[in-house]
Amino acid sequence: MAKESIIFVGLFTAILSAAILLVSCAGNDQSLSQYVKIKVQDGDTLWSLADHVAEKKHINKEDFIEWVTENNHLQTADIKPGDELILPVKKKHPAVYQLAIVN
């Protein structure tokens, strides 16, 4: 009987852990859906995006780059045309947004 109890507790713990992990991952994706997503254009860099957004939204440039890197799972600060990035700018309307960068 003790062996069955140990197996039950182990399975219950594994299932509960998996459920918590799934909920936390889904919650993160859902929370990011409130932010603007852009498509990187020729000449865009994280710093040029930071300059553009920081000026209008009063965001610290270093904090902007850290947020974008972390929430877009970037390994480096290198971005290329066609990449899609989520920016720390909340959507005002559920419409599609495109950020135009003037170089």
From Swiss-Prot:
Inhibits cell division during the SOS response. Affects a later stage of the cell division protein assembly, after the assembly of the Z ring, by probably suppressing recruitment of FtsL and/or DivIC to the division machinery. The gene is yneA. NCBIfam families: PRK14125.1. Residues 36-87 form the LysM domain. Pfam families: LysM (PF01476). Keywords: Cell cycle, Cell division, Cytoplasm, DNA damage, DNA repair, Septation, SOS response. Gene3D superfamilies: LysM domain. It comes from Bacillus velezensis (strain DSM 23117 / BGSC 10A6 / LMG 26770 / FZB42) (Bacillus amyloliquefaciens subsp. plantarum). Disulfide bonds: none annotated. One of its GO terms (cellular component) is cytoplasm. GO terms for biological process: division septum assembly; DNA repair; negative regulation of cell division; SOS response. This is Cell division suppressor protein YneA. The keyword Cytoplasm applies. Signal peptide: none annotated. Belongs to the YneA family. It is found in: Cytoplasm.
